[in-house]
């Protein structure tokens, strides 16, 4: 087994898997960046292309904020029995020791860099540091998002819409995340973009609306609610505005033509760099994360100017 590479084990019956690890070697991990290469896998369908299964290379917890990687990652939730998408720019999330995740390789990104600063002894997020870095990000890039949750009993799934006037509404692995469906009793929610089902849907969304789709595992009552709303969204049920949280009853199966999110469309461009950002020639990724250099391929902002590598 190799650090940074994800592995899936299949068993024919319930059992416990034990892997022998040399403790002495694990205790000698150097405090250096760990680069995990992302492979290209061609497909006629862009949503199926270049999927990689990546593993936390450290035998400890790891705060994804310190990954030099801005695109969404998709993680299996053991407790909620569903796939969840997270991004270092927008979420607080800590990987478990050796935990693996799915990611689509963005066109201009060749690797994920795990910086040693993300290593932790537990899952606790340093909220004071997080608040400061989020405040810094908000000065660099103006993006607004909403997280919508679908719940039945004690199972919840979520989808995200991000309004970014500089982003294309076409699918882009740098910003968007394909919805990975789970059929283990948890209701599934996603946004619909043409023929695509998305867990994260980032774009200009100039028409001010996004269609919601769902998979309902049983005839039951379900609730739609907003977890995080920077857009002031409204929910339409067959075109009629309803108040959230909103509970409805429905039969088992897919439901892609009933619910719509509406919001005020953006009127100005974004990616506004803070006026004091050039004091130390600070370099930022397109989503506002500060990085040390432009060594890797991508789009950067420095001294109010975009740099394309």
Language model features with spans:
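Compositionally biased Ser/Thr/Gly- and acidic/asparagine-rich
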Residues: 1-278
């Amino acid at each position: 087994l190799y650090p940074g590479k994800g592995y899936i084990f299949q068993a024919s019956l319930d059992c416990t898997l034990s892997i022998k690890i040399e403790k002495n070697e694990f205790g000698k991990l150097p405090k250096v960046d760990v680069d995990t290469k992302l492979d290209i896998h061609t497909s006629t369908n862009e949503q199926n292309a270049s999927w990689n299964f990546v593993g936390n290379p450290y035998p400890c917890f790891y705060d994804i904020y310190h990954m030099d990687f801005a695109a969404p990652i998709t993680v299996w939730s053991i407790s909620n029995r569903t796939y969840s998408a997270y991004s270092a720019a927008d979420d607080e999330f800590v990987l478990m020791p050796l935990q693996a995740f799915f990611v689509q390789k963005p066109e201009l990104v060749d690797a994920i860099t795990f910086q040693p600063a993300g290593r932790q002894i537990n899952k606790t997020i340093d909220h004071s540091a997080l608040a400061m870095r989020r405040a810094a990000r908000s000065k660099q890039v103006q993006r607004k998002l909403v997280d919508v949750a679908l719940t039945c009993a004690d199972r919840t799934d979520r989808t995200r819409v991000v309004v970014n006037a500089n982003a294309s509404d076409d699918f882009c692995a740098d910003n968007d995340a394909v919805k990975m469906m789970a059929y283990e009793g948890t209701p599934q929610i996603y946004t619909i973009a043409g023929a695509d089902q998305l867990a994260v849907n980032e774009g200009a969304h100039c028409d001010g609306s996004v269609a919601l789709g769902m998979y309902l595992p049983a005839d039951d009552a379900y609730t739609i609610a907003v977890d995080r709303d920077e857009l002031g969204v409204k929910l339409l049920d067959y075109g009629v505005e309803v108040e959230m949280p909103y509970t409805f009853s429905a039969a088992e199966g897919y439901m892609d033509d009933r619910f719509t999110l509406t919001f005020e469309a953006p009127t100005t461009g974004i990616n506004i760099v803070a006026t004091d950002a050039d004091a130390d020639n600070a370099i930022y990724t397109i989503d506002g994360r500060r990085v040390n250099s432009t060594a890797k391929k991508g789009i950067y902002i420095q001294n109010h100017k975009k740099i394309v590598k």
